[in-house]
UniProtKB/Swiss-Prot annotation:
It comes from the Bacteria. Coiled coil: none annotated. Keywords: Cell membrane, Lipoprotein, Membrane, Palmitate, Signal. This is Uncharacterized lipoprotein YybP. It comes from Bacillus subtilis (strain 168). It is a lipid-anchor. A lipid is attached at C19 (S-diacylglycerol cysteine). Residues 1-18 form the signal peptide.
């Protein structure tokens, strides 16, 4: 009887330890999925923003769309910064957070220009906005490795 209880206790302890590991794996996969989604959003923004900025000079609809995208990218960056990365992704997360600070500031500057009707492709290209967006998308390869 003691042997059976010992075996059951051992199995219970192993199962409990395995659950913690499983939670860590799930947390890592969830983070990877959220980070990849964020990076994809930033990539799409970086691709579309220059054309929208060019059109926004003479097109109210394009200006409104650019403003909406700028606000959306600011919110997405803030939401990403609030994620809790797994230990394996802590350095990558900090790198993206650093880029996010500049991205958010640049988005705010371009948003003000758009609201004042002063946005242009040249202004956008001279801002850190698109450059930081591209730097964030460059981190995608590192994020994909976390999911493996």
């Amino acid at each position: 009887m003691k042997i059976i209880l010992t075996v059951l206790a051992g199995v219970g302890l192993l199962s409990a330890g395995g659950c913690g590991m499983l939670d860590q794996v799930n947390d890592g996969l969830n983070y990877t999925s959220e980070a990849a989604g964020y990076v994809e959003k930033v990539k799409t923004f970086a691709e579309e923003a220059p054309e929208l900025a060019e059109k926004a000079v003479n097109d109210t609809e394009a200006k409104e769309k650019l403003e909406a995208q700028l606000e959306s990218i600011q919110k997405a960056a803030a939401d990403f910064n609030e994620l809790t990365p797994p230990d394996a992704a802590a350095e990558i997360h900090r790198t993206i957070q650093e880029h996010n600070e500049t991205l958010q500031k640049s988005a705010e500057d371009v948003l003000k220009q758009a609201e004042e009707g002063k946005v242009s492709l040249k202004e956008l290209e001279q801002s850190d906005l698109v450059q930081n967006a591209k730097q964030i998308t460059d981190v995608m390869g590192q994020i994909e490795k976390l999911g493996e």
